[in-house]
Every structure is written in structure tokens, then in C-alpha cells.
């Protein structure tokens, strides 16, 4: 039961950090390439 409580307290923290960093990355990409439908570094 103690391990379950530890897991339930760690998972929200890790998901908050993950989604926060993902949102920050998307914000920075949109700041550097505003309104880009195709990104120049993905074109071959």
C-alpha cells in the first residue's frame, strides 16, 4: 500500500514537469517560427 501511495504522489509531479516542458518547447518553436505550417528544418 505504501508503494501505491508513493506511485500516486510521483506520477502527477512527473506528468506536470513533462507537459510543462513540452508546452515550453512548443511555445519556443512558435516564437522562432511563427505561423509555420511546414518547418524548414524538416524539409528534405
Curated annotation (Swiss-Prot):
Signal peptide: none annotated. Coiled coil: none annotated. SUPFAM superfamilies: Subunit IX of photosystem I reaction centre, PsaJ. GO terms for cellular component: chloroplast thylakoid membrane; photosystem I. It comes from the Eukaryota. The chain crosses the membrane at residues 7-27. Its main location: plastid. HAMAP family: PSI_PsaJ (MF_00522). This is Photosystem I reaction center subunit IX. It comes from Arabidopsis thaliana (Mouse-ear cress). The gene is psaJ.
Amino acid at each position: 500500500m505504501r508503494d501505491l501511495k508513493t506511485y500516486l504522489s510521483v506520477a502527477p509531479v512527473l506528468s506536470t514537469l513533462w507537459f510543462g516542458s513540452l508546452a515550453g518547447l512548443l511555445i519556443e518553436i512558435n516564437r522562432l517560427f511563427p505561423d509555420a505550417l511546414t518547418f524548414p528544418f524538416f524539409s528534405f
